[in-house]
Design a protein with these regions (language model features):
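Hydrophobic alpha-helical transmembrane segments
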Residues: 57, 132-137, 166-222, 394, ...
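Transmembrane helical elements of multi-pass membrane transporters/channels
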Residues: 20-40, 170-171, 175, 192-215, ...
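Helix-loop junctions and terminal segments of transmembrane helices
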Residues: 70-87, 157, 278-306, 374-377
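Membrane-water interface segments that mark the loop-to-transmembrane alpha-helix transition
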Residues: 16-32, 58, 67-120, 129, ...
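Interhelical loop/hinge segments that connect adjacent transmembrane helices in multipass membrane
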Residues: 2-18, 189, 207-256, 305-309, ...
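Interfacial segments at transmembrane-helix termini and the short loops linking adjacent helices
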Residues: 11-15, 119-138, 334-363, 409
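Membrane-interface junctions at transmembrane-helix termini in multi-pass inner-membrane proteins
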Residues: 73, 144-170, 185, 190, ...
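Signature of the first transmembrane helix
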Residues: 4, 15-79, 112-116, 240-270, ...
Length: 449
């Protein structure tokens, strides 16, 4: 029964580290969520519902292209860089960062070209006129900074979650401040696009500066250089890992980042605006799971997957997140409607109907958050990819079908179904890996042998 004793849980140093790092990130995410609501509130009040929807679609389009193309280089740095640092192997860590940096540069270039090239073909479906089209094209130049996650991987590997927290508070502050100015002076659509653009640009630059400073402090020089194929040769299984996680994340983005765009295509910009408001509440409510996930992955990568310790750590973290999820869902249920009315106005109250449907998905997604990290730790990224593929195909089918049948409320039902599929299908390979854990490989150095 010791595994279910709460005091015993906190005797685990890794569990305490996860809680500590989550607290760092949580301190900034509470502020970020409030500032994000302020920015959306100003945009909602400063424009018509249709133009607010167009703004949301422009931002979601750029993020969707970024999410679809980019490699999950932060996972690469944590997967291979954390063991290298643990074993005092700076050269191997330098190889990992160089490979990761090169992937960011190449994928960022492909993403910006692809995003701008696709825009003329999608502009009519997205509801863009001539002015908003060019502003959307300008916003696409942010895609490389959105597609780069090497700096966050470095900061997680060196346990500098405080710097991540600082960046995560600064970007929404700048966005909120710019949105207040655009609303107060009635700068309209162009003003909000510029405000959001500048905040993203500054936020992305901060990550790179923090990461470079931490590398210098540890005397790890010349890590940020283009050396794609040579550095990869020193990292066993690197290409298999990055392609599996990239495809899995691209599929994930189709289910999440692209959802707002798809709703806009099927139902129009106004419906996309309502769905974005609901997703903002969902993302804010799901923040604890995201924070725990960012802290959980580096910790389990320091543990031997052949033992029960990382798996029990996953159970404890999932139960903790699920309990928090229930409390958060109840809070959103109680304050959601008056908060939407206060922040956005009564014309957006329909978003609360969507939120009510999506509350169950919050708890389910929180309970299942450790599964991805456990599968990556076990080297089962392809099994995770298969689960993501099936769940996402099911979600996209549900989204189109339910939107046609039930309107914008159908998008909420589809999202709930997609979250259930995701957790259920990922649980199957996770349980299989646990019962076969004695056959798993544990390569602490992360080097090619």
């Amino acid at each position: 029964m010791a595994g279910f004793n709460i005091k015993h849980w906190f005797a685990d140093g890794a569990f305490r580290t996860i809680i500590r790092n989550s607290a760092w990130l949580g301190s900034s995410n509470v502020v970020s969520a409030l500032l994000g609501l302020l920015a959306l509130s100003c945009a909602g009040k400063g424009m018509t519902p249709a133009m607010f929807g167009v703004l949301v679609i422009v931002q979601s389009y750029a993020k969707s292209i970024s999410d679809f193309i980019k490699f999950q280089t932060w996972q690469l740095v944590v997967q291979y860089g954390t063991p290298a640092l643990t074993n005092n192997n700076p050269q191997q860590f330098r190889n990992v960062v160089s490979f990761s940096f090169s992937l960011d540069i190449v994928s960022g270039a492909v993403a910006i070209v692809g995003g701008i090239a696709l825009l003329p073909f999608l502009s009519h479906s997205l509801g863009l006129d001539d002015q908003s089209f060019w502003l959307a094209a300008l916003y696409c130049t942010l895609i490389p900074s959105m597609a780069s996650s090497t700096p966050t991987g470095i900061l997680r590997a060196v346990d500098r979650f405080d710097l991540i927290a600082l960046q995560q508070a600064t970007k929404p502050f700048l966005r909120a401040a710019g949105s207040v100015v655009a609303w107060y002076f009635d700068f309209g659509f162009a003003g909000f696009v510029i405000a959001w653009y500048v905040s993203n640009l500054v936020g992305g630059t901060m990550y790179w500066w923090f990461a470079a400073r931490e590398l210098r402090r540890r005397n790890i020089h010349n890590a940020f250089k283009l050396n794609l194929f040579e550095s990869a040769r020193h990292i066993k299984g690197a290409w298999s890992f990055v392609w599996s996680t990239n495809i899995a994340h691209s599929i994930w983005s189709a289910r999440n980042s692209c959802s707002t765009v798809l709703v806009g295509i099927v139902l129009g910009p106004a419906a996309a605006g309502l769905f974005k408001i609901a997703m903002t509440f969902f993302d804010a409510a799901g923040t604890p799971a995201g924070l725990l996930g960012k802290s959980f992955y580096p910790e389990v990568m320091r543990l031997d997957p052949r033992t029960t310790r990382p798996w029990l750590l996953g159970v404890k973290s999932g139960l903790l997140a699920g309990g928090i999820g229930i409390l958060v869902a109840l809070a959103v249920f109680i304050v959601g409607k008056p908060l939407i009315s206060l922040v956005f106005g009564v014309k957006y109250l329909e978003a609360y109907d969507l939120i009510q449907v999506m509350l169950g998905a919050i708890v389910i997604s929180m309970l299942g958050f450790p599964q991805e990290s456990l599968l990556l730790m076990a080297g089962k990224q392809r099994a995770f990819l298969v689960a993501q593929t099936i769940a996402s195909i099911g979600y996209i089918v549900l989204l189109f079908m339910f939107c046609h049948l039930f309107g914008v409320l159908g998008a909420a039902f589809a999202y709930f179904g997609g979250q259930c599929l995701d957790v259920a299908l990922s649980l199957i390979p996770t349980l299989k890996a646990f019962f076969q854990r004695h056959s798993l490989l544990y390569n602490a150095a992360g080097e090619k042998s």
